[in-house]
C-alpha cells in the first residue's frame, strides 16, 4: 500500500509535494532520484533479512504491487515515468537550461534509475515472491501477535483488545444495517438488505458520469456548495486552497481516495485525490460524505489549519491516526446540519461509509488476530456491505498491508 519508488516517480508530475517550477527545483528532484538506487539496494538487503527470519509479505500484496514496479522499468527514456518532469518543463527556462536538464535526466534514467528499477523488479518477482506467505494476517509472522497488539494501541490510543474491538465491530455492523433497512423500506424493495445495497450501487441514475472530468466537475460543484455553508459552522478557515484531482494512473490500481496536505510555506495547495478507474461506474451517492471526510471540513481543515497556527513543529506536522480520522468522521456527520443528507440517496451513501468503518473493526481484527484468510475477509465485506469483489479485494489488501490503521475510523 504505497511505496517510495512509485511515489518518487509520481513527483515528476510537479503536482505533488515536489515542486517543479524552477531550475533549482529540477536539480533538487534529480538529486532525490539519484538516491533511489541506494534505497533500493538497502530495501533488497532488508527483504532478504526478512526472508531469513520469516518476516515476509503475503503473496497477494506483492502480486498486486508488481505492475507498478514493472512500470518503472520502461526502457524508452522518453516513455519512462521518471521523464515526466522533462515533458512538463516550464517554457520560461532558457534553451540552454532545458537542454542541460534534459541531458542530465536522460543520463540518470539510463545509468541509474532504469538499472535499479529492473533490479528491484527482478528481485521481487524471482527471489522474493516465491518466499512470500500464504497467510494474510500479521500474527502469522514471528512475534506478530504482540506486534499487532502494539499497533492496535498505537492507532486507536485505547487499551481495547483486538477481541473487544472485534465484538464492537459486529455490534456496530448490526446497528447500521438496521438503519439502512429503514431506508430500504421506503423503496419498497423486496429482497435482502445486501441485495438492496447491490441494487442501489448498480442503478444507472447514480452513475451519471462519462469521463474523469465529469467526476472532478461534480466534486467541484460539491466543494462550492459546502464552502458556502462552512462559515455558519466555523469561525476560521484555512488559507491554503484545496484542489481536486484524479489519482494518477500509475497508482490507481492499488490506491484509495486520500488527501495530501499543503506546503507549510503556502507554495502548494491541499489536494483531494479520488480514484476513478472507470467513470461510468463511479457512484455519486457516496461523494458527499467522502468529500466531507477527505476534503473540507475534514482532512483539509485539520491539516491546513494545524500548519497555519503558531504551534511547535511537532504539533504542526504530527499525525495521530485516531485524532485525524476521528475529526474526519466528525466532519462527515456535519452533512446533516448542512442539509446535505436530506436526499435519502445521499444519506444512504453516508450510512454506507459508516458501515464500512464498522466492517473495518471486524475485518482488521479478523485478519490479524483471528487468522482470517484474504478470501474470508472479502466475503464478509461482500455479504455485509454489498460491495463487488474488486472493491473487497482492494480494501482487504489495504488492511493486510497496514495492520491496525483501519481501526482508527470508529
Predicted regions and their residues:
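N-terminal maturation segment of proteins
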Residues: 1-410
Amino acid at each position: 500500500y504505497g511505496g517510495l519508488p512509485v511515489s518518487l516517480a509520481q513527483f515528476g508530475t510537479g503536482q505533488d509535494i515536489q515542486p517543479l517550477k524552477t531550475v533549482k527545483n529540477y536539480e533538487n528532484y534529480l538529486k532525490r532520484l539519484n538516491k533511489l538506487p541506494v534505497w533500493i539496494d538497502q530495501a533488497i538487503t532488508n527483504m532478504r533479512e526478512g526472508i531469513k527470519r520469516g518476516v515476509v509479505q503475503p503473496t497477494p500484496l506483492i502480486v498486486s504491487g508488481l505492475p507498478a514496479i514493472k512500470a518503472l522499468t520502461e526502457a524508452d527514456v522518453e516513455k519512462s515515468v521518471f521523464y515526466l518532469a522533462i515533458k512538463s518543463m516550464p517554457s520560461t527556462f532558457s534553451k540552454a537550461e532545458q537542454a542541460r536538464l534534459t541531458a542530465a535526466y536522460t543520463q540518470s534514467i539510463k545509468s541509474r534509475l532504469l538499472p535499479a528499477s529492473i533490479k528491484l523488479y527482478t528481485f521481487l518477482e524471482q527471489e522474493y515472491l516465491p518466499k512470500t506467505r500464504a497467510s494474510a494476517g500479521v500474527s502469522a509472522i514471528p512475534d506478530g501477535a504482540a506486534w499487532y497488539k502494539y499497533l492496535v494501541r498505537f492507532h486507536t490510543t485505547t487499551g481495547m483488545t483486538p477481541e473487544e474491538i472485534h465484538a464492537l465491530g459486529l455490534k456496530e455492523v448490526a446497528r447500521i444495517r438496521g438503519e439502512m433497512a429503514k431506508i430500504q423500506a421506503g423503496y419498497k424493495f423486496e429482497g435482502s438488505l445486501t441485495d438492496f445495497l447491490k441494487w442501489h450501487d448498480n442503478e444507472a441514475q447514480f452513475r451519471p458520469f462519462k469521463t474523469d472530468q465529469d467526476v472532478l466537475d461534480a466534486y467541484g460543484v460539491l466543494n462550492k456548495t459546502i464552502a458556502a455553508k462552512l462559515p455558519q459552522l466555523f469561525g476560521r478557515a484555512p488559507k491554503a486552497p484545496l484542489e481536486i484531482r484524479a489519482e494518477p494512473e500509475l497508482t490507481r490500481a492499488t490506491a484509495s481516495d486520500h488527501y495530501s496536505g499543503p506546503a507549510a510555506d503556502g507554495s502548494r495547495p491541499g489536494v483531494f485525490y479520488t480514484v476513478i478507474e472507470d467513470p461510468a461506474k463511479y457512484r455519486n451517492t457516496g461523494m458527499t460524505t467522502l468529500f466531507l471526510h477527505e476534503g473540507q471540513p475534514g482532512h483539509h481543515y485539520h491539516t491546513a489549519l494545524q500548519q497555519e497556527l503558531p504551534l511547535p513543529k511537532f504539533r504542526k506536522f504530527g499525525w495521530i491516526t485516531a485524532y485525524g480520522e476521528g475529526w474526519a468522521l466528525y466532519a462527515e456527520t456535519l452533512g446533516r446540519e448542512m442539509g446535505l443528507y436530506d436526499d435519502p440517496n445521499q444519506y444512504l451513501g453516508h450510512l454506507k461509509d459508516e458501515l464500512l468503518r464498522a466492517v473495518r473493526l471486524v475485518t482488521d481484527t479478523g485478519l490479524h488476530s483471528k487468522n482470517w484468510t484474504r478470501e474470508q475477509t472479502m466475503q464478509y465485506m461482500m455479504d455485509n456491505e454489498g460491495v463487488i469483489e474488486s472493491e473487497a479485494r482492494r480494501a482487504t489488501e489495504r488492511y493486510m498491508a497496514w495492520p491496525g490503521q483501519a481501526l482508527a475510523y470508529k
